[in-house]
A protein has these predicted regions:
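Structured-RNA-binding interfaces characteristic of tRNA pseudouridine synthases
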Residues: 1-244
């Protein structure tokens, strides 16, 4: 039996996240149905992680086992004939039978975009958080340094999740500005439920003067969700890369 690895990208605006849900349209269900039409058998489609409602992905990785003999290089073309315009498969390959798109991942990179100006943008409103109040990007950069390294990030997670450990390692966390767009770029070995969005919301609080950047290490070590910032809205978040 073959293990097929897919790379897809999607605009998450009109989906209730990645994971299949009983009464909602999800990315996983949509891709799974397209795959099954091609291979003509039931498959279990495994994803590299759960993205929430409204969150986007440029390089999402998933895999499935199949007895189909269709050449992997033809799969993207076949799948895209069945997928809607807001989901695209751009790569497929046969991979090792032990490959698991989630547990085999060693790092993930997310980007969060903030439109920081008075008026919203009709094009960017699906892909950024419009925040009209001034933000001090230098303070945000100072605070971002505190996240680097291995920490217990329980204070930067929403409730309603179950994991073996809440310790995660952040390899890099950069904040930069291009015109009216502030970008938060983070790479880690894994992320808790809503962790990146809470980091983004916290850095916005820092940039807006609600949190002192020099207090960030203490806030992380406190493991207190109440001391961190808000959970930033989903549309600004995009999964950029998964590393294996």
């Amino acid at each position: 039996m073959r293990n097929i690895k897919l790379k897809i990208q999607y605009d998450g605006t009109d989906y209730h996240g990645w994971q299949i849900q009983k009464n909602d349209i999800t990315v996983q269900e949509t891709v799974k149905k397209a795959v099954q039409k091609i291979v003509n058998e039931d498959v279990h489609l495994t994803g590299c992680g759960r993205t929430d409602t409204g969150v986007h992905a440029e390089n999402y990785v998933c895999n499935f086992f199949t007895n189909s003999r269709i050449p992997s290089e033809k799969l993207p073309y076949a799948l895209n004939t069945y997928l809607p315009n807001d989901i695209v498969c751009f790569e497929a390959e046969d991979t090792d039978e032990n490959f698991h798109s989630n547990s085999s991942a060693v790092k993930k990179r997310y980007v969060y975009k903030i439109l920081n100006r008075e008026f919203p943008d009709a094009v960017m409103n699906r892909y950024s958080w419009h925040y009209k109040y001034p933000l001090d990007i230098e303070k945000m950069r100072i605070a971002a340094k505190a996240f680097i390294g291995e920490h217990d990030f329980i204070g930067f997670a929403s409730s309603g999740f179950s994991v073996k450990t809440t310790v995660r390692k952040i390899y890099s966390l950069d904040v930069y500005k291009n015109g009216d767009i502030i970008t938060i770029d983070v790479v880690g070995n894994g992320f808790l439920y809503n962790m990146v969005r809470i980091i983004a919301g916290t850095l916005v609080f820092v940039g807006g003067g609600k949190i002192n950047p020099n207090d960030m290490a203490d806030i992380i070590n406190s493991k207190d969700r109440e001391r961190a910032g808000i959970t930033a809205p989903p549309q600004g978040l995009c999964l950029k890369e998964v590393y294996y």
